[in-house]
Structure formats: structure tokens, C-alpha cells
Amino acid sequence: MQELEMAGQGSLRLSRKSDTIVVLEKDLSTEQMVLSMGPQHPSTHGVLRLECLTDGEVVTEAEPYLGYLHRCFEKHCEHVDYPAIVPYTDRMDYLAGINSEMAYCVAVEKLLDLEIPRRVEFIRVIVSELNRIASHLVAIGTYAIDLGAFTPFLFCFRDREHILNMLEWATGARMLYNYIWVGGLAYDVPAGFNERVLEFVNYFRPKALELQQLLTENEIFVKRTKGIGIMPADVAINYGWSGPMLRGSGVQWDIRRNDPYSIYPELDFAVPVPDGKLSVVGDCLSRHLVRALEIEESLKIIEQCIDKMPGTQGFDPRSAVPKRVRPKAGEVYGRAENPRGELGFYIQSDGKSTSPLRCKARSSCFVNLSAMKDLSRGQLIPDLVAIIGSLDIVLGEVDR
């Protein structure tokens, strides 16, 4: 019997029989280590820093540090006119600028008690759903890269390019649109826009199914996401989760259905939630599946809007746009279903100024990120990357 001393780690006693070494006893101890991920790190989406307390490869706690993209959005809003705030909202969730514009305008129009022309409402929904699909394609493509798959990223951005080209044709911009105005739109859609959108829908529907199968039928992708980062429905509700994050936990909640705005009450679409067959309800794979299934529902909504949209003769997209926005004294909370969840605006008016007394943004990304401690506890460090990617956060909206 031979005993070897190992500094700080007890002893390792070895027994030699012929040429074979057999380990009889091993006393090893571990100690916790602080691991900093970010703010510039391949695993983080945007400028986010995670301070992780680890025991070996196991994460015992992950604390997010925010504020690297803080731009004083809410304070700026108190010093500009109501319509001038719209371009600021584009720069919050810059991957879904039109959806952010929609949420803000819904709130201001509610405060003003404005009636919006029907054609404007249909156009708003069409461009919002196109923007939703483009945003989900970024989420799915970058998530695949996070987990080591490069090909799906190329497919996603190939098809996203078609959407950005259509939005550029309609709005004049690819990302920061300033298209939805308080009371109307900057422009009507160009002639032939509806036909081009329908052509894209017919082209993209089989591509979306192919993309879904490419990942959900990939054994490596499933093993990296199934059963990882599980969030029970009751805990998700207590955190205030919304959007695909909440639906991924099995809660069928969608503001377009549960608290409808615009012309969504007239449209027929499903609110997908995981059934537990492919994934564990509430895990990373469930959240991915919800985003993939929502793409098909957005295509259905677009088709219905084009079919029901009123004609263009004599249409002025700015007919209901007020020349000067000075709401009566009061307060309002308006919200919309963004690709990442509920984006809401609490606006307070003093009845005198053309600027809001207070404009508070309720960010879905900030709320979703707040659950990082619970999601990461007990997970392995490589799984932490899968969890962060499943949140689909945009730090421009988190920090504002």
C-alpha cells in the first residue's frame, strides 16, 4: 500500500497489484469561485454582466448587473412633445421597433380618446406582425449559435432580410422606423405592398416549418435545452413574466387575446403553449417552441388583415393625427404584445404641457431577466448560456 499526500485536498491511497493501479479512497474538497460573464462575452446578448457564484461546474447563484446601455429614456420623455417620443421607443427594443411604437401610441391615443381610421389599424397590425416574425427569427437564429449550430442562423437571417426589405419599402427604414404616429401613420403603404406581403407569406410558410424541424428534431439541440432552466407557471406569474416566456411555462396569456387592442378582436389566431410532448413545460426548449409556433400565427394574422383591409381611395394616413398633442389632466396605462412580452407605458399628463409629466416604460425584458437567479440555481455553466439565450432579452429595452 502506498499513500500520496495531496496539498489541501486530503490524501490519495493507491494499491499496486502487478501493473494495475486501483484507487481505494479519494478525499477531495471544493470551494466556491466567483465567475464574471460579460459585459463583453460571447454568451451574453448585448452589454450584460453576470456575476456567477460557482461550485466547480455548478452555478449556485447568478446576479445580473445592468445599466451599461442606460440612456435616460424616461427623463428625456419629460422634455419633448408626445409625438417626438415615438423615435425614442424604436431605440428601446431595436429588433422590434414597430411593436414598441404601437405600444406607446396605444397609450397616448387612450389618453386622448382618439378614434383611429380602420385602414390605419390594419396596416399597423400587418407591419407589427412582420416585425414580430423578424424578431423571432433573430431570437431563433442567435439561440442556435449560442448552442453551437451555425446553419439555422443563416436560414433565419436569409428570410429576415425579405421582411426588412418590405418594411424598408413601406416605412423608409430597416430598423428604426418612426412609422406609427399618434393618431395615424407616417405614410400609407406603397402600391403593390399587399401583393408582395402575400407572396412572402406563401414563400415563408414552408420555410418556417423547415426551420422548426431543423432544431426541434436535432438531438444535440434538444439535449442542450430540454429540462434546462425550468420555470413553473406560478413562479413565472409571481415574477410578472409575459409573452413567450410566460406561455413557455404553460400559461395561455396574450394581450392581443386577453386585453385586445387595435383590430385584434376581429382576427382569428391561436395562442400556442407547450403540450409537454417535445419538452418539459417551462424549460428552455418550451420557450423556443413557443416562438417558433408564433411565427405561423403571425402569418395567419397578416393574411386576414390583407383580406379585410379597406381600400385606398381618398385615404389620408394622417387624417386623425392631432396638430398639437395636449391631453387633458389624467393618467393612463397602455400596453401591447411585443415579441418579448408585454410592453406598457404609464403616462401622466398635467393638462397644460405638450410633454408628459411622467412617462414610465414597463419593459418585458427587464422583468424576464429578474428571474435569472431562480433559473440558474443548480445549473451547469454551459447550461447558463442556454438559459440566457432562451430569455431573448434586448439590453436596449432593459436599460433604457
UniProtKB/Swiss-Prot annotation:
Gene3D superfamilies in the record: Cytochrome-c3 Hydrogenase, chain B
Keywords in alphabetical order: Cell inner membrane, Cell membrane, Membrane, NAD, Quinone, Translocase, Transport
Known catalytic reactions: a quinone + NADH + 5 H(+)(in) = a quinol + NAD(+) + 4 H(+)(out)
Membrane topology, record value: Peripheral membrane protein
Keyword presence, Membrane: yes
Localization annotation: Cell inner membrane
A GO cellular component annotation in the UniProt record: plasma membrane
Top-level taxon of origin: Bacteria
EC number: 7.1.1.-
One GO molecular-function entry: NAD binding
Similarity annotation: Belongs to the complex I 49 kDa subunit family.
Quaternary structure annotation from Swiss-Prot or TrEMBL: NDH-1 is composed of 14 different subunits. Subunits NuoB, C, D, E, F, and G constitute the peripheral sector of the complex.
Stated role: NDH-1 shuttles electrons from NADH, via FMN and iron-sulfur (Fe-S) centers, to quinones in the respiratory chain. The immediate electron acceptor for the enzyme in this species is believed to be a menaquinone. Couples the redox reaction to proton translocation (for every two electrons transferred, four hydrogen ions are translocated across the cytoplasmic membrane), and thus conserves the redox energy in a proton gradient.
HAMAP family for this protein: NDH1_NuoD (MF_01358)
Protein name: NADH-quinone oxidoreductase subunit D
Gene behind the chain: nuoD
